Amino acid sequence: MDALQLVSNRSETDVPALMHALGQQARASAHALSLASTEAKNLALRVAAEQLRKRTQDLLLANARDLEGAKAQDANAAFLDRLTLDDKRIEAIARGLDEIAALPDPVGRMLARYERPNGLVIERVATPLGVIGIIYESRPAVTADAGALCLKAGNAAILRGGSESFFSATIIHACLTEGLRAAGLPEAAVSLVPTRDRAAVGEMLKGLDGTIDVIVPRGGKSLVARVQAEARVPVFAHLEGVNHIFVHRAADLEKAAIIIRNAKLRRPGVCGAAEILLVDEACMATHLAPLTRMLLDAGCAIRGDAATQTIDPRVTAAMESDWRTEYSDAIIAVRVIDGLNKAIAHIETHGSHHTDCIITEDQEAADRFLAEVDSAIVMHNASTQFADGGEFGFGAEIGIATGRLHARGPVGLEQLTSFKYRVHGNGQIRP
């Protein structure tokens, strides 16, 4: 274990050797964890939650250290919000661990069972994926959510958090380790990469000599693009949230205002925040001005098209890039668009297939939007900030997968399993 003691980004660290050791220990732990009882896994999670509550002050001090470093790098307000922990957020992290412990164990779940004419009984049963590498940026809570979900689904996890949240993640990981120890499970089942050296990411993307089965990136566009370009193992891609709200001609104005304000401004830095507002030309005369002024008065900057710029001098002109930008801040792009067909086409062209919403009282229009918009999550009359595993009843999530293979939408327990076939015979041979 000496090679895995906490280190920083010192040049003398042998990163390939360090990561190779992590991979080997994770692979050995994965087998033991795949056979672990539900009771042991739940105990580990409950003890980890208890440790988080006990070590709140330690975590706040570590987080203050992270915030100091981020401010020194001139991080913006949305970034600092994602990084910040307080008593309430720490309790939410601990409660999330308890909630994952309370969820049904997905491992061993019978997915299908049938009998063939020759008497063979075939069962499809959920199994762990193996070793999951998770690469993420500034959110300290991801350390707990990702580690806990992988653990409950019987997977070993190698967590590589952002350098900005290094000290916070270290305390959270220590709490998870205490839980594993208390439950008699391998401590290396959830590993935190103990260096901020960026070379560690490159080693993970190579697969650590075949020890990593899947990579899950959670972060900005540049991180996900690098992972997709360089990874030699399968990837659950979590692309940026260029999320749209389309205000249809049959939208209730009061309902639209409430939804849009929440979707943009509740927490502008989360991946489910709305970034683009499309207003149907047919309701522009009644809806555009009040919605625009509501956002401006609430402190949201607007990048608008020509029609939106005439509403208020505080609106600045949108550039072409604004229609495909994840601001992660109190900024939104607003455009008037000619009906449902054009709105769907705009989302297909400029969106990231993450989360998109229509606001309308016309059920036929809503049904078309839900059927034709090819995003992981499509919504009708609800805030895009519900794009969250916890809100979906998954307990938590590792991210929102925007690809089309295996996992799509919130990646929770079920998405962190695969399956195998069990075949029961009574001496049958194939003719």
Swiss-Prot record:
Recorded catalytic activity of this chain's protein: L-glutamate 5-semialdehyde + phosphate + NADP(+) = L-glutamyl 5-phosphate + NADPH + H(+)
The UniProt record lists the keyword Cytoplasm: yes
Its EC number(s): 1.2.1.41
Main location: cytoplasm
Gene3D superfamilies attached to this UniProt entry: Aldehyde Dehydrogenase, Chain A, domain 1, Aldehyde Dehydrogenase, Chain A, domain 2
BP GO annotations: L-proline biosynthetic process
Keyword Amino-acid biosynthesis: yes
Protein name: Gamma-glutamyl phosphate reductase
Source organism per UniProt: Beijerinckia indica subsp. indica (strain ATCC 9039 / DSM 1715 / NCIMB 8712)
UniProt lineage: Bacteria, Pseudomonadati, Pseudomonadota, Alphaproteobacteria, Hyphomicrobiales
